[in-house]
Every structure is written in structure tokens, then in C-alpha cells.
A protein has these predicted regions:
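Short amphipathic alpha-helical segments
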Residues: 19-21, 43-44, 72-73
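Glycine-rich FAD pyrophosphate-binding loop
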Residues: 23-48
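Central helical "cap/lid" subdomain
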Residues: 39-40, 50-55, 207-213
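Active-site/ligand-binding neighborhood in enzyme catalytic cores
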Residues: 91-93, 100-213
Length: 213
């Protein structure tokens, strides 16, 4: 029976990096995962020649140059900038919520105008201390944006009305009073250029005992 220094549960980024560094330090690692594949939530599968993210798009982002250089030893990353948009009955809005969103919604141009509009709608809703997700969202971005871009999506995502969801879920919602459409503020960001996330994980785990290699 083989003896290991570490049993690593989970073959996602954290487990793969730990196993890689432990192996470099001369340790024996066994990596296990309940899923039938490695790479955790960054797992991709090829469909018609395209690497599709099974669990939703995952973009690597960091402000740490050393971390960026570290991951680039396993794959070359492109400079993908995540600038999503939402389509509400033919109306296109930028995400995360920023001045482009507010301008499209209300015709406002300056941050002061946008903040005044949000405050007006918060006051009209009579919200002082948000008690649920709906009230928290209105406090952050106003009633119009909540009704068009948050209510339906979030209710579908969680399977219950926003009035039944706790306020803390949306407290970290990015709201920017600039015209920057970049979802992340990180200096370094991207997706592996020509290889899948699975290939990145395989390269990280290549000297370890792990599933599906």
C-alpha cells in the first residue's frame, strides 16, 4: 500500500497548486475528487472545437504580478476583459452597473446625477434599513435597475422571490460611478489562450497521483 504525505481532497485550482508545490518540495500527494473530472469549477469541455466552461465562465484575475507569472508557466493567457451586457426586451445595459448603465437607464451624465436618482428611488421606496435582497438592491441601484436587471434574474437563480432572500447576498454587488465597463479591477486578467482549463490542471498535477489524468 502506498504511503502519502498529503491527501488532497479536490482537484480544483487550490488542490492542484498545493499538490504541485508539495511535490516540488519532495512530498508524496494523493489527489481525489468526487467529480469525474479534474479542474473543479474551472473545468472546460470541448464542443465543436470550442472550450466551453461547464460551470459558467471563469476568468483568472489578480493584481499580484508574481501570481500572474506563476500561472503563466502552465499556459499562455490571453488578455480577455470581461465586459458583460444585459438584454432587457431589446434594451442593452452594461454590467457591472456603471455610468454607462445609468446613462442608458435615466439619461444622466454625471456621477452626482446618478447618485441623486438612486437616492430619490430609495427614498420613494421608504427604505432605511434593508431587510431583504430586494430592499438592498433598491438601496444600491434604485428601483428601475432592480426591476429590469436584478429581480427576474436573481429570483430565477435562487428559486425564490427576492423579498425572501437575505440582504447580504447582494451587498457586494459592484456599482461604479465611472464609465469603465471592466468587470474586474485587476491589473492582470485572462483565460488560457490555446489550451483548456483541464490541460492547465493536468500540467499542474502531472507529477502527482490524481484522478482522470
Amino acid at each position: 500500500m502506498k504511503q502519502y504525505d498529503y491527501l488532497i481532497v479536490g482537484a480544483g485550482l487550490y488542490g492542484a497548486v498545493f499538490a504541485h508545490e508539495a511535490k516540488k518540495a519532495g512530498k508524496r500527494c494523493l489527489v481525489i475528487d468526487k467529480r469525474a473530472h479534474i479542474a473543479g469549477n474551472i473545468y472546460t469541455e470541448e464542443v465543436e472545437g470550442i472550450n466551453v466552461h461547464r460551470y459558467g465562465a471563469h476568468i483568472f484575475h489578480t493584481n499580484n504580478k508574481a501570481v500572474w507569472q506563476y500561472v503563466n508557466q502552465f499556459a499562455e493567457f490571453n488578455r480577455y476583459t470581461n465586459s458583460p451586457v444585459a438584454n432587457y426586451h431589446g434594451e442593452i445595459y452594461n454590467l457591472p452597473f456603471n455610468m454607462n448603465t445609468f446613462n442608458r437607464m435615466w439619461g444622466v451624465v454625471t456621477p452626482a446625477e446618478a447618485k441623486a436618482k438612486i437616492e430619490q428611488q430609495r427614498a420613494e421606496a421608504g427604505i432605511t434599513e434593508p431587510k431583504n435582497l430586494e430592499e438592498q438592491a433598491i438601496s444600491l441601484v434604485g428601483t428601475d435597475i432592480y426591476e429590469k436587471l436584478i429581480k427576474g434574474y436573481t429570483g430565477k437563480q435562487w428559486g425564490r422571490p427576492c423579498t425572501e432572500l437575505p440582504a447580504f447576498i447582494i451587498k457586494r454587488l459592484p456599482v461604479r460611478f465611472t464609465y469603465d465597463d471592466n468587470y474586474f479591477n485587476a491589473l492582470y486578467q485572462g483565460i488560457p489562450n490555446s489550451v483548456s482549463s483541464v490541460s492547465v490542471s493536468k500540467r499542474t498535477l502531472r507529477y502527482c497521483n490524481a484522478p482522470s489524468l
